[in-house]
């Protein structure tokens, strides 16, 4: 129990209800049947449970520990970079060591070859513990999935290992300043150079985690229009634009022409900074075309279903966590504890004993 601004807050150590998770995975979805498939033949239910338990420990120790602090001390721009509270970097390192970013990928790719449903369940714990901090690895996984699905073999070789091991992080830049809804209105331009690379110029806004010091490099997936491309959605292409360029030998080169123009204020998820980025103030930011020209929206749409599921699961995780907080509060708190006139709050009945409170808790749980 803590007291803030004169109000009693009752905390809970539970992130999610483990019994509910077991019911969903093994009784409702019959996840164990996946073990009959050749791809998961080397796994077991014990491994699934151990994965979830390890994730729960990381969520409790490295994510939940700074949820309140990260809301009170959101990222700040120091004139060069966006700085976070120390716990954010510790959480990133912990989740990288856990292997969540690449857990679904095959052993050949360096992953854990876990079923998608187990990975999703693990992410529920992380989202419930601190959904803002969890956005860093979720966007990195989305970036890796785009490159894995549509990038060239050379692009996969250069970027995927570092994205999977947490050396690089990733973002997806879609919206532009003054363009909030229609991707077909994208004005960012891309010019082809003699060496086969592109130079892009323009602005992107609402880029979540567009700048930070958690990783050595940030890989931006950016939608732009190649010069001479058709108007509308059919003329948009997808590009890889790294914050730091990569030399042929794999070492870091010079900084790309990407400038942080603004760090936007947020109502929620404050530990994930929403940024405005400027690409190519001079010659243009160096970019690498993903897949075929003019297929950018098609490629991005392929990961949207997965993104929608992840966002929805995050909402479900927060709702479940909110219910646990409400339940714990009702069990420990009595109406007299909120009243300054009470001399002996410990002997009063708890809120959970109220029929109306039970009704509200049941309604909250059902949703």
Predicted segments, located by residue:
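Amphipathic, small/basic residue-rich leader segments at the start of a protein or domain
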Residues: 2-135, 158, 181
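Short, glycine/acidic-rich hinge or "gate" loops at secondary-structure transitions
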Residues: 66-78, 135-139, 331-345
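Flexible, glycine/threonine-enriched loop-and-boundary segments that flank and lead into catalytic domains
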Residues: 79-93, 100-105, 171-192, 203-212
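Long, K/E/R/D-enriched contiguous segments that form extended
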Residues: 107-109, 113-151, 155, 163, ...
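Internal maturation/activation junctions in enzymes
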Residues: 139-140, 151-188, 192-196
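A short core secondary-structure module
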Residues: 197, 201-255
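A glycine-rich, basic-preceded beta-loop-alpha segment at the flavin cofactor/substrate interface
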Residues: 208, 245-261, 266, 273-307, ...
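Mobile "lid/hinge" segments at catalytic clefts and subdomain interfaces of large enzymes
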Residues: 307, 314-318, 322-327
